[in-house]
From Swiss-Prot:
The lineage of its organism: Eukaryota, Metazoa, Chordata, Craniata, Vertebrata. The modification Phosphothreonine is found at residue 12. This is Coiled-coil domain-containing protein 89. Belongs to the CCDC89 family. Residues 18-38 have a biased composition (Basic and acidic residues). The gene is CCDC89. Residues 1-38 are annotated as: Disordered. It is found in: Cytoplasm; Nucleus.
Amino acid sequence: MPQEESAPRMDTPSSEEPLDKQNRKLEDQEEEMGFKELDGLREALANLRGLSEEDKSERAMLCSRIQEQSQLICILKRRSDEALERCQTLELLNTELEEKRLLEAEELKAKNQQAQKLEERFMTLASNHELMIRFKDEHKRQNAKLREENEKLRLENDQLFSPALKAQEAKVVQLTAQSEALAKELETLQRKYAHDVCQAQAREQELLELQNRQACAHTEETEQLRMQLQSLQQQQQEALQQTAKAEQAHSQQNQELRARLQTVTREKEELLLLSMERGRVLQNKQAEIRQLEEKLKMADVARRHALERFEQEAVAVNSNLRVRELQRRVDGIQAAYDELRLQSEAFKKHSLDLLSKERELNAKLRHLFP
């Protein structure tokens, strides 16, 4: 029996094999040992039947040895089960630790990326700050230089130009002020016209909404009257005795419908009167625009006369710098006048568009209420 016990111990698998395979091999070896012990017990019992007292005492010793071996086997099996449980627990702990390690690695990677982005942003901000400082210094330097040049030019202008040119400059300033006043007047008229147009559009929208509501109400009333008429016809077919009463109610409803139609007709006439009044307002605005255009033409003529006088007087002056300065101012006045003329044309075009829209609206109203 000791030889049989030593044999399975030599067949124990190495630690390099997986734990589940080792457990299965241990279980198989224990089963084989149990079968072998049972076979040995059967053989021993068969031999004991034909043995003497000495053999029986020897058999008792063998039985005690067998019990000891079985106890040892139980102890070994219990230890192997405990070792298996410890291995499984260690595997679970290892798995949890591996998952935690992966999570910590991902968090560390994310924090590293965030730190890298913050560092890149900080470097970008630092470079932008340096560029801003350089730009500010350069701007200060150029500003100081331009101020010095401006002061020099002002002193030269004070020394070079005569009172005649100053008077001419005063005339140019006066013409510029007149042009600005005309521009402000035009802007005021434009704002007033825009306000009137907005009010007219709002009134038109209100009238259209009122018309739509009245049309819907009229349609609903017509539908209700039609349904009532059908009901009256059915009642007439069912009960011939109530014919007189039904005709009287029907005539009353027709009278109410005529009265409502007359009310709608009066409202349509009021809408037409409002549209005509709006047309008169637009005509008045167009008259104001024509007056403004005449003023612009007069200002243009005055500007041309001033330019001619300025050119005649500028020929006698032997200073290219002052002539260029005055020419720049004249060009500025010309640009302002061109811009004012373009605004006037745009305002005129907008007025024509509004007039065409009003005509279309009047045509639609006439089509709806012939």
